[in-house]
Amino acid sequence: DLEKALADLCRTVARDNKVDFADIKYVGIGTPGSVNFTTGFVGFNTNFGYYDWNLGPDLEALLGCKVYVENDANAAAYGEYIAGGAKGYNDAVVITLGTGIGSGIILGGKILRGFNFAAGEMGHNVIVKDGIQCTCGRRGCWERYASASALTRETKAAMQADKNTIMWKMTQDIDHVNAKLAFDAAAKGDETARKVIDSWIEYVGVGIANVINTFEPEVICIGGGVSNQGEVLLAPVRAYAENETRNITTGKFPVICACQLHNDAGVIGAAALGSSI
């Protein structure tokens, strides 16, 4: 089963790195879903179809060491906090723009989990009343407008509406369109692509402004494949968020930067979970 496969993987990683597993003090795991960090209990994980999953204790029995289990977005945020774009700051928010929008919040050097261990779901803050249906059951959630998949959706819609856009020449099949296409076409001067990008970035900025107004972090790190666009993405997001932020009284605006650890953030954060207590 999955737990045995995870235990075998842990031992394999230790062996491949010439580490005696008996010397391992603890194992850290990041998983999607609602996670009770104290008990290692996963309330639900829709990716694997697990509900009421006693992951931490079950793995401890298999491995013979302490196992820390954390929400994957929190683990990624902690990774950026200790070794990436948020290193050196006490208050940080890490936003990942992907299929949805993942978010992890660090306040005073500690992961914000909430009393039900589900705090920080910024992607499910509603920004458009009665807007697009979200998988969570609500309508108008931020991730339905500002995720990478939302950008892909709007790119396809724009292509269908404009058969003359150069985006048709840049892809073999509309079903293979990704979030990068509109950026590439806009860089070539395509007006349709530019409108798609401008609208999408505005939605990203709306959510980032909400993050600032709610948590006032020192730094916001933006991750996901679209963050590879660098200042093409970050500069207008900063400008929009700064214009929409109302509670900055010191003249200091949060740093808004790209994540540095990319896909390794969650691994690094999970590996360091024991030090976060």
PLM regions with names:
Residues D1-Y26, N36-T39, P57-V67, G79-Y89, ...:
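ATP-binding/phosphotransfer module of carbohydrate and carboxylate kinases, centering on a glycine-rich
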Residues A73-A77:
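Active-site-adjacent loop/helix segments that line or gate small-molecule/cofactor pockets in enzymes
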Residues G28-P32, V94-G100, G104-I106:
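Short beta-strand segments
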Residues D72, G98, A270:
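Active-site glycine-centered loops adjacent to acidic/histidine catalytic or metal-binding residues
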Residues D52:
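Short catalytic helix/loop segments, enriched in acidic residues and glycine
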Residues F41-F48:
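Short glycine-enriched, charge-decorated loop/helix-capping segments at active-site entrances
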Residues A118-E121:
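Structural signature of FAD isoalloxazine-binding scaffolds in flavoprotein oxidoreductases
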